């Protein structure tokens, strides 16, 4: 299972990549493996305001529907429309092709409250 060291992680299994003044968000390799084959992804519109720890969308797999939670607060500036036609990217490439949204954070320092790769790995190994 892949847990890239340069990313930050939420306890709800979202990953965060800081890219200058924006933040790219997706779900982790662990999350996609637990969900099974992803068949549908529901994401917010560009311009939507997100609040940290509040739902912003969902992923549907053959097993279940799981909500996505915003790891930090901010405004959605990009949505990965590729996932509409290719939800399987979430299983195949969770950290690259399957990024979900890009936000302009309300406060970039919120990223510091997220888990490091090491902390995330410890958390999932406790479950």
Swiss-Prot record:
InterPro entries reported in the protein's UniProt record: 2-oxoA_DH_lipoyl-BS, Biotin_lipoyl, GCV_H, GCV_H/Fam206, GCV_H_sub, Single_hybrid_motif
Domain of life: Bacteria
Any single GO CC term annotated in Swiss-Prot or TrEMBL for this entry: glycine cleavage complex
Keyword Cytoplasm part of the UniProt annotation: no
Cofactor binding notes: Binds 1 lipoyl cofactor covalently.
SUPFAM superfamilies assigned: Single hybrid motif
Residue positions where N6-lipoyllysine is found in the record: 63
One Pfam family here: GCV_H
Keywords: Lipoyl
Record domain Lipoyl-binding: where: 22-104
PANTHER family: GLYCINE CLEAVAGE SYSTEM H PROTEIN, GLYCINE CLEAVAGE SYSTEM H PROTEIN-RELATED
Subunit structure: The glycine cleavage system is composed of four proteins: P, T, L and H.
Protein name (Swiss-Prot/TrEMBL): Glycine cleavage system H protein
Species assigned in the record: Anoxybacillus flavithermus (strain DSM 21510 / WK1)
